[in-house]
Amino acid sequence: MEERQRGQSRRNPKSRRRQRGPAAGWLVLLLVAAAAAAVSVFFLRHLKVQEEERAKTRDSSEAVVAEYFPGDDRNEAAKDSAASEEELEGKTPMTVEEALQEMTLREKVLQLFMVTPEALTGVDEVYAAGAKTEESIREYPVGGIVYFKQNLRSPDQVKDMLTRTQKYFRDNTGIEAFLAVDEEGGQVSRISGREEFGIASFPDMSEIGASGEPQKAYEVGDKIGTYLADLGFNMDFAPVADVLTNPENTVVARRSFGTDGAVTAAFSNEVVKGLQAHGISAVLKHFPGHGGTTADSHDGYAATERTLEELMAEDFVPFLEGGRAGARFIMSGHIAAPAVTGDNTPASMSPKMITEILRGTPGYELKTLGYGGIIITDALNMGAVTSSYSSADAAVRALQAGNDMLLMPENFQEAYQGVLTAVENGTLSEERINQSVERILKVKFH
């Protein structure tokens, strides 16, 4: 009751104040509005300052990225890196014949080259794929890229780099590239045994061969194929199919499966099966066999003194059986076989060794391997080649010999221009180029 009376006694004074002070009310409203406007102006100015600071930060970040990823624009590369399945829906895949008809001579010649990302982009060390990579692929859509340890830093980095790179090839040419690595397992490994990849090392292949269990070779190929496919590769320069026929050989002693041709074939074939089960094209190397040499073709002249009969009975067996088992590539080595060819020409440059014997020419059926897949040279920047041939000469001679792909010429631009000029002046026929491109596309469109 008392509280109610107090409340009632307050009403009249308030009523009186409202009645006699309308001007004061308007004044209050004006003051509130002015304050709100001031706050708004201050807030907008604050937002503008923040945006300017964010812009400065972005510019600074881009400068840092440009420093650590020379030649690559990461913002451009951040565009959708994975190939969109939706983009491919409704499109009829090209046949090999259709692709060949649509390709220019320049495009066909470029398909014959496999180079490092550094040779393609001109960047000193490549470990990312962005605007510079895309620009280089648009200008020089080569057949493939081979990566080495310095390019491979972590699983996520490799996946991102390869996914973007392959997308640039698809977007610019409609044809995927061979993305390769030299991952034999054991002595030669770019990925396994490295802490950052979390993949255990493999035993040397000589140890695998000595086990007498070809299944172990399959397990090597299967495991390597699994993680290479996961990272984005589609090609591996493995297995070593060299038979260790010279006990003094140290080049492939730990990398070879053994001293017997049939045993080496059995083990190398299992690696091929393991790799290719995961979509990784295998490369049998190094025809006619590095196991019979003493010198290393990386450094200079290397030769085997074995006769054709001896080679056919032992050294050639893994290549013959590997081809029959479906190996998509055979690598030709820079190894001379004077007892076969009559001179010191490296096998990779010899029409007799590549076209007549490895590929097979009518009339040589009894002493030929009849290989129908892709023949790729060993690296053309090796001493056995550079000591005797220019980049252009080596590339042209390798194609004349019967190789389909040219790996890592010492000077890519010179080699490419040399092949193009050779076709234009008739030294090489376009039909010869078409034969190799057809073999390449058959594997890519497989």
Question: Where are the model-predicted features located?
Answer:
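Hydrophobic faces of well-ordered beta-strands that scaffold small-molecule active sites
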Residues: L110-P117, G143-Y147, A177-E183, M235-P239, ...
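Second-shell residues forming the walls of enzyme active-site clefts
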Residues: T104, V123-E125, A129, D156-T173, ...
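Non-catalytic positions within long, well-ordered alpha-helices that form the structural scaffold/packing
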Residues: R138, A229-D230, G323, L399
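Substrate-binding cleft of extracellular glycoside hydrolase catalytic domains
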Residues: D171, A177-G221
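Active-site-proximal loop/short-helix segments
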Residues: I191-F197, N234-R254, S281, K285-A302, ...
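N-terminal hydrophobic targeting/anchoring segments and the immediately downstream early-domain regions
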Residues: E2-L179, E183-G193
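Mid-to-C-terminal alpha-helical segments outside catalytic/metal-binding sites
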Residues: E424-H446
